[in-house]
Amino acid sequence: MSTIEERVKKIIVEQLGVKEDEVKNSASFVEDLGADSLDTVELVMALEEEFDTEIPDEEAEKITTVQAAIDFINANQQ
């Protein structure tokens, strides 16, 4: 089983079409990885599906970096 971090990074690579080595924990989806607002919405939806969780809109707005996504999933896994 892959770690949460590995799974989150895999989703980011697939959703944003970036190279795996570009996906650093500190990377911002918009500034560093070139995502636009639609990309970030699709990314949140993919994370919800992968981890069978719901990310409320107010929380989704705070998920702007790779680490923020990892932290949210870690904090909200059953």
Curated annotation (Swiss-Prot):
Pathway listed: Lipid metabolism; fatty acid biosynthesis
Annotated protein name in UniProt: Acyl carrier protein
HAMAP family in the record: Acyl_carrier
GO biological process: lipid A biosynthetic process
Molecular-function GO term, any one: acyl binding
Annotated coiled-coil segments of the chain: none
Upper taxonomic lineage: Bacteria, Pseudomonadati, Pseudomonadota, Gammaproteobacteria, Enterobacterales
Family in the record: Belongs to the acyl carrier protein (ACP) family.
